[in-house]
């Protein structure tokens, strides 16, 4: 959650319209939080498109910067998480709106968060990796000019995500650890640092260095500030136990994660992370058909959202599973598709770089 500041009238006039200074009634604050809890647990629900306007009005009356940010970001998240037509234009417009708001209230953290966590990540989801990288590098240049460590940390977060999407995991981890270093050695607050600990641990596991993961996962759990942080760390524990050959512990950890998703509605938007770990678990323990069934469900969802980048990675996983099932001809066809898509992506990236 962004640090809370009180909006001065001049900022409200510039950003949100003319508002008269007033004493905030505690009833208004309670009503605002109740309204938020009622309508904003699921960012993919169309109700947020109208509810966000109402929440913004409430936030203005309460002089609440945090709720103003949430209200402005609600429409952005609706499109970011895969809803509505003209998504790209809507995401860009929403990011720019949030960045303008952040500059007007002097919130550099929000400014770079909108740029990194929404615009850069959106391009990653769309498979536009070079555009994402260009945006992340522009961010870093701007942040270094300003000289604020918290802004630079947000840029490291963005660069880590881009390199992970490009399959350059060691490079991705390098930027994760840079962000972690800023968090551990300065007074910079990183709300989502728990996820960076978890993600860095997962890369160690994937690189066959799982002995380095437990310390990072302990730090991840210690830094938890939301259900999403907690479930992210626990999902990585599933991968750790699988790497250690402890399938019993892996199954227990997976069941714990399933229960966490069932108990917390706000995790619905992140359900794909659970599915990915379920696929990996079933694959590793030999439940190949079950893994393929979950994978097919994921493919259907990704096609609906037109998430082509993740779809191709998933098909590579499907090919790996089919190969282990000795269905080598089917696997070979998927491998060819994957390599062809990689070639096309390289050509697209070269065009972007030339442009």
Regions from the language model: what does each represent?
Residues 26, 66, 70, 109-111, ...:
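Residue signature of alpha-solenoid helical repeat architecture, marking inter-repeat boundaries
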Residues 19-77, 84-96, 104-109:
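N-terminal leader/linker segments that initiate helical-solenoid repeat arrays
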Residues 35, 75, 118-119, 152, ...:
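Structural register within alpha-helical repeat arrays
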Residues 37-47, 79-91, 120-132, 163-171, ...:
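Short coil/turn connectors between adjacent alpha-helices in alpha-solenoid helical repeat scaffolds
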Residues 1-36, 159:
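Bacterial Sec-dependent N-terminal signal peptides
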